């Protein structure tokens, strides 16, 4: 939700160029990694619910400070603070609390549900950020964002988590931060959110994102009907084929039926592609590495979105290429990398679990 708001605000209030505004917005993705080395210490030394709720509260408080800053540098600082806090929230929710409250035989499903919910939430936020700016002031939308954070705090507070005695852990480690075993599939996965991030910059039509959401729901319905696991190569082929088809439509025209048809195709493609990439990211971790593996996925997903935002704006400003064509190229690279190397990597390392 904050991306379209802050991007537009940077241009209108601070007279930033499109590329500068994209850079200020995308620094959020780098900041996600700042607290990572302390993640395991935080959630195994302090109450996990408290770590989560207090991080969300600080995230909300930082968010309402934007109207009071006096320089672009202070805006960058707020983006860094929000990125770091959001990184802690991601770790405390998706890779910690969601697993803690789920029986071991249902944890794969819990990871999937959390992922699907986060994608729907991201698309909903983009729509609110685009449409809300037409009816409400910047300050009002920031307070609405803080209100949503308050709702999240209430919901997390209602979760019952078993008591865990504090552990004597080192201050810094890679636990609950980055799992190198899943890093290569994760880098391959980043091509999917990078394409989405590029579209976030290029298209400000809320109905387009509703079409993406509809396509994603179509994938979920297909997945419920055909419950048997699909071959990974075939699933990635289908996903990237739909995404590529949507991008080709946008290369021809990004208005009217072309735009909405492309959104539907991209939504279906994202669903199929992420379905397989997520499967790898939750099956490759060894015993007691699930939280770290899933957090690696979360970090790389968010980083991919922010990287796509910056790449799209850079390509637009350079003026040498059509950003949709660049996005199509990224889609093809992701497909080829999976088919040539990552599928064999997954098969080999999964069999050695």
What is the predicted role of each segment?
Residues 23-41, 213-222:
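Central cavity-lining transmembrane alpha-helices of secondary-active solute carriers
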Residues 104-157:
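Helix-loop-helix hairpin linking two adjacent transmembrane segments in secondary transporters
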Residues 34-70:
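Conserved MFS/SLC helix-loop-helix module at the cytosolic interface between two early adjacent transmembrane helices
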Residues 57-71, 241-254:
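C-terminal ends and interior cores of transmembrane alpha-helices
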Residues 231-277:
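C-terminal transmembrane helical hairpin of 12-TM major facilitator-type secondary transporters
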Residues 78-117:
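Cytoplasmic helix-loop-helix junction between adjacent transmembrane helices
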């Amino acid at each position: 939700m904050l991306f379209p708001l802050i991007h537009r605000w940077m241009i209108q209030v601070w007279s930033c160029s499109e590329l500068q505004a994209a850079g200020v917005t995308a620094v959020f993705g780098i900041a996600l990694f700042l607290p990572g080395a302390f993640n395991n210490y935080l959630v195994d030394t302090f109450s996990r619910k408290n770590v989560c709720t207090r991080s969300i509260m600080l995230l909300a408080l930082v968010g309402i400070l934007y109207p009071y800053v006096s320089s672009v540098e202070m805006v960058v600082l707020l983006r860094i603070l929000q990125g770091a806090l959001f990184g802690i929230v991601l770790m405390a929710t998706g890779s910690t609390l969601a697993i803690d409250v789920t029986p071991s035989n249902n944890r794969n499903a819990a990871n999937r549900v959390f992922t699907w919910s986060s994608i729907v939430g991201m698309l909903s936020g983009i729509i609110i950020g685009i449409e809300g700016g037409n009816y409400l002031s910047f300050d009002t939308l920031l307070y609405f964002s803080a209100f949503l954070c308050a709702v999240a705090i209430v919901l997390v507070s209602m979760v019952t988590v078993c008591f865990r005695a504090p552990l004597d852990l080192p201050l810094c480690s890679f636990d609950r931060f980055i799992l190198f075993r899943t890093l290569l599939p994760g880098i391959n996965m980043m091509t999917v959110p990078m394409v989405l991030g590029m579209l976030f910059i290029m298209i400000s039509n809320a109905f387009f994102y509703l079409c993406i959401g509809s396509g994603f729901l179509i994938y979920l319905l297909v997945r419920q009907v055909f419950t048997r696991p699909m071959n990974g190569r075939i699933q990635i082929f289908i996903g990237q084929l739909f995404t590529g088809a949507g991008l080709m439509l946008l290369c021809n025209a990004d208005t009217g039926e072309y735009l909405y048809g492309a959104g539907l195709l991209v939504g279906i493609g994202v669903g199929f592609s992420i379905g397989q990439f997520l499967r790898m990211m939750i099956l490759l971790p060894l015993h007691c590495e699930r939280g770290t593996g899933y957090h690696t996925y979360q970090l790389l997903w968010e980083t991919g979105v922010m990287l796509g935002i910056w790449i799209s704006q850079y390509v637009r400003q350079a003026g040498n290429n059509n950003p949709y064509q660049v996005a199509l190229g990224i889609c093809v690279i992701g497909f080829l990398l999976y088919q040539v190397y990552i599928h064999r990597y997954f098969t080999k390392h999964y069999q050695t679990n």
